[in-house]
């Protein structure tokens, strides 16, 4: 009798579901399983996402211990902002009409047309598109990322051992920071180089130098309370409008300035790439967008604030997806200008999205490396970059931009089956070889009609 009772008791105990390998197992807002199947360990990457990875890989996984402070935002109703008008210059020095200092924003649920100027003029030539890029850059700085300063009044550099020292001065203030260079065992100097945020997470390509850029030293990303901290803010003031990602892009530009000043560093400054993963992947995309001397941008698993579009992510969130959105991300770290806070709950009024940010890189090289982790918004990333790809198509160089989304691996763990794709882009843009970079793949499909109501012109 007793044995029968215990057998019935065991049957009555619910079996707790477990997440599969590579599945989510925790995070703020997660209501699914919090344990993993046998042979897998739940690893926390940030307070919002934990993933089941093979136990043999758990000890080497990148896990974040950053705590997120509480943050309250209110919905803003204003749809205009004022800033002094600035003249803009397109690629090749083309003179472009400046945006007015005050503009009226209009709600648009679809992704903004890459080929229509803010004043309604259609883009029909490559020169006109360069003006559109300058306009989008200004809009993104004005409403999301903050103003990017130019080269400071004074800049000097020195090189010793493998360390490049950059000294900057502005308005009586000065800062100094360093990067370290690891040279390849093959190839000939001056070497092409990849600037890696936090050192980067990609394997070092043959014949290419790797430059370790400590972006956290330029602008902190500890939590929202770290806004205004770092070398950039020591120079320009803690209340500068630039968010951390803009500050990092400024730092990357100063590294390239310094390399141009110091030929003894043995770096070919016409063959510079930039990379980073996760939060640093967001930063790498921003640097590639703003710094035209970068010929190859390699953002890895950048998610929200990187290769994902705000509009698409908001929609997917409304459909039940566990995905990071604009209204959530501003409470994680000071990556954006505080101006952005007023728009995160009214994303459709923004006169751009992140397909616009990526399109600033065209026609230069861009290879977007993504994962299929829910929190990164893989559907949003693929849809967003599909829209961005139209910029390269319009310019007649569609193979200068590639996209690869492969899952079943830990966050920022570069899988071997993307190696040949990465090599092709590096060889084409950094080593001057002829390779096939017509790469655009994902397990998802992009519903272009839902987000795109404009066509791709052939620019003359």
Swiss-Prot record:
Q: Which UniProt keywords apply?
A: Disulfide bond, Glycoprotein, Hydrolase, Lignin degradation, Pyrrolidone carboxylic acid, Secreted, Serine esterase, Signal
InterPro entries, sorted: AB_hydrolase_fold, CBD_sf, Cellulose-bd_dom_fun, GCE-like_dom
Q: Is Nucleotide-binding included in the keywords of this UniProt record?
A: no
State the active site.
278 (nucleophile), 411 (proton donor/acceptor)
Every CBM1 domain range: 18-53
- UniProt subcellular location: Secreted
Q: Which Gene3D superfamilies match?
A: alpha/beta hydrolase (3.40.50.1820)
Q: Which SMART domains match?
A: fCBD
The record lists its disulfide bonds as 96-131, 277-412, 309-384
User: How does its activity hinge on pH?
Assistant: Optimum pH is 5.5.
Map motif GXSYXG catalytic site motif onto the chain: 276-281
UniProt lists the family membership as follows: Belongs to the carbohydrate esterase 15 (CE15) family.
Q: What is this protein called?
A: 4-O-methyl-glucuronoyl methylesterase
* Record organism: Hypocrea jecorina (strain QM6a)
């Amino acid at each position: 009798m007793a044995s029968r009772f215990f057998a019935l008791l065991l049957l009555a105990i619910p079996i707790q579901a477990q997440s599969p390998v590579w599945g989510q197992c925790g995070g703020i807002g997660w209501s699914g399983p919090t344990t993993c199947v046998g042979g897998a360990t739940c690893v926390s990457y940030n307070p919002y996402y934990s993933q089941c990875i093979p136990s043999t890989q758990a000890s080497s996984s990148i896990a974040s211990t950053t705590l997120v402070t509480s943050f309250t935002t209110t919905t803003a109703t204003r749809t205009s902002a004022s800033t002094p008008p600035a003249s803009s210059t397109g690629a090749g020095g083309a003179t472009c009409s400046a945006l007015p200092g005050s503009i009226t924003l209009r709600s648009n649920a679809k992704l903004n047309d890459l080929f229509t100027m803010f004043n309604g003029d259609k883009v029909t030539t490559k020169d006109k598109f360069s003006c559109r890029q300058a306009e989008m850059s200004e809009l993104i700085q004005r409403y999301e990322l903050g103003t990017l300063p130019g080269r400071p009044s004074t800049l000097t550099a020195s090189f010793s051992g493998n360390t490049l020292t950059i000294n900057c001065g502005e308005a009586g203030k000065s800062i100094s920071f360093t990067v370290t260079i690891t040279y390849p065992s093959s190839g000939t100097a001056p070497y092409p180089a990849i600037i890696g945020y936090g050192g980067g997470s990609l394997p070092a390509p043959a014949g290419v130098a790797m430059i370790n850029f400590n972006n956290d030293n330029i602008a902190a990303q500890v939590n929202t309370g770290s806004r205004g901290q770092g070398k950039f803010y020591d120079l320009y003031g803690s209340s500068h409008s630039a968010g951390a990602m803009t500050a990092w892009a400024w730092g990357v530009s100063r590294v390239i300035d310094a390399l141009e000043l110091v030929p003894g560093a043995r770096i070919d400054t016409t063959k510079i790439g930039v990379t980073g993963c996760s939060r640093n992947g967001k930063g790498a995309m921003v640097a590639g967008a703003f710094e035209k001397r970068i010929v190859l941008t390699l953002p890895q698993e950048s998610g929200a604030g990187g290769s994902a579009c705000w509009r698409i992510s908001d929609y997917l969130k409304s459909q039940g997806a566990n995905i990071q959105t604009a209204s959530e991300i501003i409470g994680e770290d000071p990556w954006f200008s505080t101006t952005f806070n007023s728009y995160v709950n009214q994303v459709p009024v923004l006169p751009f999205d992140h397909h616009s940010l990526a399109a600033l890189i065209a026609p230069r090289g861009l290879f977007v490396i993504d994962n299929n982790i829910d929190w990164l918004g893989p559907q949003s990333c693929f849809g967003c970059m599909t829209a961005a790809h139209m910029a390269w198509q319009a310019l007649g160089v569609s193979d200068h931009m590639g996209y690869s989304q492969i899952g079943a691996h830990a966050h920022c763990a570069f899988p071997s089956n993307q190696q040949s794709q990465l090599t092709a882009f590096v060889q084409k843009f950094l080593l001057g070889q002829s390779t096939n970079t017509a790469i655009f793949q994902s397990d998802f499909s992009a519903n272009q009609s839902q987000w795109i109501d404009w066509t791709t012109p052939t620019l003359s």
